[in-house]
UniProtKB/Swiss-Prot annotation:
Chain residue ranges for the region called Disordered: 1-29
Protein family according to the UniProt entry: Belongs to the krueppel C2H2-type zinc-finger protein family.
InterPro entries (UniProt xref): Znf_C2H2-type, Znf_C2H2_sf, Znf_C2H2_type
UniProt xrefs under SUPFAM superfamilies: beta-beta-alpha zinc fingers
Alphabetized Gene3D superfamilies for the sequence: Classic Zinc Finger
Key words, A-Z: DNA-binding, Metal-binding, Nucleus, Repeat, Transcription, Transcription regulation, Zinc, Zinc-finger
Organism for this UniProt entry: Pongo abelii (Sumatran orangutan)
Main subcellular location of this protein, as a coarse class: nucleus
Protein known as: Zinc finger protein 271
Subcellular location, record wording: Nucleus
Its job: May be involved in transcriptional regulation.
Extent of Basic and acidic residues compositional bias: 9-22
ZnF (C2H2-type) residues: 80-102, 107-129, 135-157, 163-185, 191-213, 219-241, 247-269, 275-297, 303-325, 331-353, 359-381, 387-409, 415-437, 443-465, 471-493, 499-521, 527-549, 555-577, 583-605, 611-633
């Protein structure tokens, strides 16, 4: 582009400008001034401002190399020198205007009072107030207040990068970008913070840094009024509200709201980990991860909570911790009313609604909704247990399990219930417990109408529909739908009874059996019927009792359609159809279909007669015999029967359906 320049008119214009020292509210000839500054259009905005406010002579120096050969020769002759700064000028007027910059700023804005040493700078400044943007882009609808800004912008369309680094050959579209880039090679950091010893290569970085000291957050989100110290942060934040994800992965089409997230994501595909630790052999895909990792070696915890003094090695962990004190939960689910203190918790929660499980196990094809769950699951296959307890040496596959285990030694229960006096060592136990108070059952079965308070209960229940039994016994090949059932079953083979009663010498294979047994000693009956207020020591006994009031008989026979309130009654009934008599008398070899029939029969051999007639004091070994005898006493009240020794009632819980032999458990009968 050849620049046409009229030296005479320019010199005359500068002289007339120099003579006019009055305050300018309205420039006498804006067109003339605009024409004068157009040769500077190749300069960056930051440098241009310095040129216009420093000296007219420097202005000519900047564009002189764009002129033709004849005009360049004119610029080589610079007889007018500044004694103070040593600068040279082609014309006297240039030197005159330059000297004014040492002391004078005669051009003042009538809107805000800001003063300038040259009129052209005032003209540009006034466009801030007027909003005037006279320079339009031919490629798009954008307009600019300065021609230099237009030229820079047009390079977006043309791809022109005229400024090249001598060190590495990298090219830039703006000279200011080249200057900043060259500071990488020189190490120059000319912008120093007045509050601390930090220096910066860019002024904008210094401005951002100083907001750490001042606490200034000038950028506000118009959706939620959240404040930010950097404009880029508010732009990123607003994408939470809009859902915009403009950065897409070429490999898997996953989209991201931030370009930095895309770059990090792409390293999953490439496997690139460019940040190695110099203390150990670990490498990281993110520099921030390396910095965090190094604190493991140094033990540094630079982030301290103002509320409780607790220190953390990561700022993000401190922010999450502070939400315990503030109760802030800034991440709401758009499917339900739940809110979360962490974005990762929201993402994991949303997979409950979508059913998404993006993390497959390459050993067994099991799918997981969270990557951390996959990592934990892998340890089942590898047997790895990297977390060891300092107290007892026990090892764990998960760090969370070690932390929970250590609370056995310390007795710590940091999660108290706000509704009662109970405390818990695990937060998950508190959440489950609170559902007793609220009655919440958030986990619904999609096969039937049943709901559950815990997700694990739903998973177990769904196996009733699917028939899945993923847990196999190595000793007898028996399969179970629940891992807990397998563990209990394996104790049949091992004979293990790890739960000891402190009141007597009895041991139990299940903790639940110990708890039930201990109620014999305490007399506790915590389960009360809401209909008749009768109390029971076991929940299962209450459930069976309530069916007396409701008439519910949920156990139907497939052969004849007869229904029963108890599953054990159904099993006994089905033996009528099959003819099965698994209970044999040791004394005479007679077989019976139910255990109760065997017990009644054994009283004959023992000579036991617990049923006595109140009319004649005669005793009988079986209740049926007493009933027949009572018919002898005609007209007598057949209901005046005193059971000298109340007969034992046997339930399905007494003879565990989990592979135990009922004949060996006769002493486990309970009275309910």
């Amino acid at each position: 582009m050849e620049i046409q320049f009229n030296y005479e008119s320019q010199e005359h214009h500068l002289l007339s400008d120099g003579e006019n020292k009055t305050k300018i509210g309205k420039p006498a000839s804006e067109e003339g001034i605009t024409a004068k500054i157009e040769p500077l259009t190749e300069e960056s905005s930051s440098l241009r401002e310095n040129v216009l406010q420093d000296s007219e002579g420097r202005e000519f120096c900047e564009f002189g190399d764009k002129l033709n050969e004849k005009d360049q020769n004119v610029f080589k002759r610079r007889p007018h020198n500044c004694d103070e700064y040593g600068q040279s000028f082609v014309w006297n007027t240039g030197l005159f205007r330059h000297r004014k910059t040492h002391c004078e700023k005669p051009y003042e804005c009538d809107k805000c009072g800001k003063a300038f040493s040259v009129s052209s700078a005032l003209v540009l400044h006034q466009r801030i107030h007027t909003g005037e943007k006279p320079y339009s882009c031919n490629w798009c609808i954008k307009s600019f207040s300065r021609s230099s800004d237009l030229i820079k912008h047009q390079r977006v369309h043309t791809g022109e990068k005229p400024y090249k680094c001598d060190e590495c050959g990298k090219a830039f579209s703006q000279s200011s970008d080249l200057i900043i880039h060259q500071r990488i090679h020189t190490g120059e950091k000319p912008y120093q913070c007045s509050h601390c010893s930090k220096s910066f290569s860019q002024r904008s970085d210094l401005v951002k840094h100083q907001r750490i000291h001042t606490g200034e957050k000038p950028y506000t989100c118009n959706q939620c009024n959240k404040h930010f110290s950097q404009s880029s942060d508010v732009i990123k934040h607003q994408r939470i509200h809009t859902g915009e994800k403009p950065y897409k992965c070429d490999v898997c089409a996953k989209a991201f709201s931030q370009s930095s997230d895309l770059i990090l994501h792409q390293r999953i595909h490439t496997g690139e980990k460019p940040y190695p630790c110099n203390q150990c052999s670990k490498s990281f895909s993110q520099n921030s991860d390396l910095i965090k990792h190094r604190r493991i070696h140094t033990g540094e915890k630079p982030y301290k909570c103002n509320e409780c003094g607790k220190a953390f090695n990561q700022s993000s962990v401190l922010i999450l911790h502070q939400r315990i004190h503030t109760g802030e939960k800034p991440y709401p689910c758009d499917q339900c009313s739940k809110t979360f203190s962490r974005l990762s918790d929201l993402i994991n929660h949303q997979r409950i609604h979508t059913g998404e499980k993006p993390y497959p196990c390459n050993q067994c094809n099991k799918m997981f909704s969270r990557r951390s769950d996959l990592v934990k699951h892998h340890r089942i296959h590898t047997g790895e247990k990297p977390y060891e307890c300092d107290e007892c040496g026990k090892t764990f596959s998960q760090s969370s399990n070690l932390i929970l285990h250590q609370r056995i030694h310390t007795g710590e229960k940091p999660y108290p219930c706000s509704d009662c006096t109970k405390s818990f060592s695990r937060r998950s136990d508190l959440v489950k417990h609170q559902r007793i108070h609220t009655g919440e059952k958030p986990y619904a079965c999609n096969q039937c109408d049943k709901s559950f308070s815990q997700s694990s209960d739903l998973t177990k229940h769904q196996r009733v529909h699917s028939g899945e039994k993923p847990y196999h016994c190595n000793s007898c090949e028996k399969a179970f739908s629940q891992s807990s059932d397998l563990i209990l079953h394996q104790r049949i083979h091992t004979g293990e009874k790890p739960y000891l009663c402190t009141q007597c010498s009895k041991s139990f294979s299940q903790n639940s059996d110990l708890i039930k047994h201990q109620r014999i000693h305490t007399g506790e009956k915590p389960y009360k019927c809401s209909e008749c207020r009768k109390a029971f020591s076991q929940c299962s006994a209450l459930t069976l009792h309530q069916r007396i009031h409701t008439g519910e008989k949920p156990n139907p026979c497939n052969e004849c359609g007869k229904s029963f309130s108890r599953h054990s009654d159904l099993i006994n009934h089905q033996k009528i159809h099959t003819g099965e008599k698994p209970y044999k008398c040791d004394a005479c070899g007679k077989a019976f279909s139910t255990c109760t029939d065997l017990i009644e029969h054994q009283k004959i051999h023992a000579g036991e007669k617990p049923y006595r007639c109140v009319q004649c004091s005669r005793s009988f070994s079986q209740l049926s015999e007493l009933t027949i005898h009572e018919e002898v006493h005609c007209g007598e009240d057949s209901q005046n029967v005193m059971n000298v020794r109340k007969p034992l009632v046997y339930t399905s819980t007494l003879f565990s359906t989990r592979d135990t032999v009922p004949g060996k458990n006769l002493m486990n009968a309970v009275d309910y």
